[in-house]
A protein has these predicted regions:
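General beta-strand recognition
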Residues: 89-91, 111, 194
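C-terminal edge-of-domain segments
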Residues: 8-9, 18-40, 146, 150-250
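A generic structural signal for short beta-strands and their flanking turns/coil linkers
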Residues: 64, 79, 86-88, 106-110, ...
Length: 250
């Protein structure tokens, strides 16, 4: 048996089809749409990288948590934050009382990372185990959204991103709640994505060892909605709750 191709190529959908690996490799990287710089250029397994804007949007639209990194007087800080995409911008929000976020008033360089985990990859050797994933890293200056119209648009985007349909089915933020919240905007410009979606990449010498190899697919799936005990009885579960699902875009 010949050894599999060493370089595992990226595919934009989350469906693992071993036979399509070869065809995916022929495509190479998509033409740069996001801005490629020294920081965003992928050097290791460059064949998994892309600067395609639509592919980046698909990852961001499916993800739910971003890890935001920035320098502070106390060193490098990384904070998990909820986010939403508004066109070609990411909006993030947190509490005005946060000592970290209050320092963003004049704008601050950040890196934003979103990762979707699609599978655990089991190889013959412990060293060759891996994960299938889709990820984006974005660099830019985070600026504070101060106008009320912009903040209101961001609040709606946050809820629509995580629970489509809920904004119209809930009380909107009042002035006090808006004043207690800081909204940050980061351009989706200097960024790159990286995707792994393929079987184990065992070396030829390990292929005959006889261990089970393959992929354990992983995905985020909702369970049955749990009603709040203090809610008025007889309330029907909304369709957007009963049919909740994250977007999956190829």
């Amino acid at each position: 048996m010949s050894a599999p191709t060493e370089n595992c190529c990226a595919r934009r959908d989350r469906v693992l089809v071993f036979g399509e690996e070869e065809n995916a490799q022929k495509g190479g990287n998509v033409a740069a749409d996001l801005r490629q710089t020294d920081k965003t250029t992928i050097s290791r397994h460059a064949e998994r990288g892309s600067y395609d804007r639509e592919a980046a949007y698909a990852i961001l639209d499916e993800g739910m948590v971003a890890h935001v990194g920035f320098n502070s007087d106390d060193g490098v800080i990384v904070i998990p934050m909820t986010y939403a995409r508004l066109g070609d911008e990411l909006v993030l929000h947190g509490a005005v009382a946060s000592r970290w976020l209050s320092s963003f008033e004049q704008g601050r360089p950040v890196s934003v990372c979103v990762t979707l985990l699609d599978g655990l990859v089991l190889a013959q050797s412990a060293f060759s185990h891996s994960m299938n994933y889709r990820s984006i890293v974005c660099f830019g200056v985070a600026t504070v959204v101060n106008d009320e119209a912009g903040k209101s648009e961001a609040f709606k985007a946050f809820l629509d991103h995580h629970i489509p349909g809920r904004w119209e089915d809930s009380r909107q933020p009042d002035a006090k709640e808006s004043g207690a919240t800081i909204v940050l905007s980061v351009p989706i410009d200097e960024a790159s994505i990286k995707v792994r979606s393929c079987p184990p990449q065992d070396s030829e010498k390990d292929m005959g060892l006889g261990y089970w190899t393959g992929v354990i697919p992983l995905e985020l799936t909702p369970g049955e909605a749990i009603p709040y005990p203090a809610m008025e009885p007889g309330k029907d579960v909304p369709d957007y709750v009963r049919n909740y699902a994250r977007p999956i875009r190829g």
